[in-house]
Regions:
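Electropositive
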Residues: 1-85
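Conserved beta-structured recognition patch
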Residues: 63-116
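Flexible, acidic/histidine-containing loops and adjacent segments that form or flank the divalent-metal
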Residues: 119
Length: 120
């Protein structure tokens, strides 16, 4: 997903990537929200129709060769943004056209201790 980074479900999380102190409690907290992000994403993409789009301001592929894209419903709901709003992801440190909006969504989630921002 373009512009967002969720905690890992299959490997250890590094709390410092999320601005959190490194502790067992925070690693466990991030693992919990990794599973919630996975469930949220699964439900989102199981809708009848979703659209995938790339961004001309961003690289098409990430460090692991994965396609980087926005995922939207036909009604215009954006998965990437919803993950940030819910506190299931952080803004990724790359260039893309929705960065300003995504930063704002992340900041609001942090201020309201949503999702992973309630860790620590």
């Amino acid at each position: 997903l373009l512009g967002v980074d969720t905690p890992e479900t299959s490997s250890a999380n590094n709390p410092s990537e999320y601005g959190l102190r490194d502790s067992l409690e925070n690693r466990e907290c991030l693992s919990k929200y990794a599973l919630e992000a996975k469930s949220f994403t699964s439900k989102f993409v199981q809708r009848e129709t979703i659209e995938i789009s790339t961004d001309s301001d961003a690289d098409r592929r990430g460090d692991y060769g994965r396609l980087l894209a926005y995922v939207d419903t036909v009604e215009g709901e954006n998965l990437n943004a919803r993950l940030l709003e819910s506190g299931y992801a952080r803004v990724y440190s790359s260039e893309f056209s929705k960065r300003k909006k995504f930063n704002s969504l992340e900041e609001t989630a942090m201020e309201n201790d949503r999702g992973l921002w309630s860790c620590d």
